[in-house]
A protein has these predicted regions:
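Extracytoplasmic/secreted envelope proteins and their assembly/folding machinery
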Residues: 48, 88-92, 124-128, 187-191
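Short beta-strand-centered interaction patches in the first periplasmic/extracellular domains
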Residues: 61-71, 104-172
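Short, surface-exposed ligand-recognition loops at beta-strand->loop->(often short) alpha-helix junctions
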Residues: 81-85, 182-185
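Short beta-strands and strand-coil junctions in structured, solvent-facing domains, enriched
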Residues: 22-24, 72, 101, 135-139, ...
Length: 212
């Protein structure tokens, strides 16, 4: 099971397996993990991240939980006072402290802040502090191992979903449309898709992707 949403700081995944594989698995927290899905020998990365806790095959657990790179940000503590900085400079520093370098940050120009103290906060909390200090409400998340702040992942193609072709079910729940389809590993949240259906048609933005 894989969960990815615009409204969540991090993506997560759970891998469940039968008892016959339990003794063969031994994983440590922060071991790297990748999940791939695809067709005809062509695979797409649908999740990249890390094991979120130690797993010993000798236990009775039959599930491994994973989190994306935000796990490293949650465990990185920022404790400093920053002078004459911009949001992008601060966020780049937080990422570097977590050992992360792949990022795409907004190119918008923001005024320099003379001083911003951050005391014993995780890197995630520190980013929220930066947003608050500049009065910003912008999304940030990881996708494909890249950190995005007020930016979206590149999309090379807008895929079409059509009733009777690749739409299994389409219903409206909680003010949003939920589309059920076959596995679509190439679709990420914040991507655009094209819908052809009697209930709703046109180009829409994906807010959440759940794979089971």
């Amino acid at each position: 099971e894989i969960y990815s949403s615009k409204s969540s700081y991090y993506d997560w995944a759970k891998i469940r397996f039968t008892s016959q594989f339990r003794p063969k698995l031994s994983l440590k927290k922060k071991d790297p993990a990748t999940i791939q899905l695809g067709y005809d020998g062509t695979l797409e990365d649908v999740f990249t991240g890390f094991v979120s806790g130690n797993y010993d095959g000798g236990t009775y657990a039959n599930e491994v939980a994973l989190k994306d790179e935000m796990l490293l940000m949650e465990e990185t503590i920022i404790n400093d006072t920053f002078l004459d900085t911009t949001p992008q400079e601060l966020i780049s520093y937080f990422l570097a402290q977590a050992g992360l370098s792949k990022m795409k940050l907004s190119s918008k120009t923001y005024p320099t802040r003379k001083m911003l103290p951050i005391r014993r906060q995780t890197a995630v909390q520190a980013i929220n502090a930066v947003n608050a200090a500049w009065g910003l409400r912008v999304p940030f998340f990881f996708s494909g191992g890249v950190f995005y702040w007020d930016e979206k992942p590149e999309q090379k193609k807008v895929y079409t979903f059509e009733r009777g072709v690749n739409i299994l079910n389409l219903r409206r729940a909680g003010g949003v449309w939920e589309l059920e389809t076959v596995s679509a590993p190439f679709i990420k949240h914040s991507h655009k898709i094209n819908l052809i259906h009697p209930q709703v048609s046109g180009e829409v933005e994906v807010s959440k992707v759940v794979s089971k």
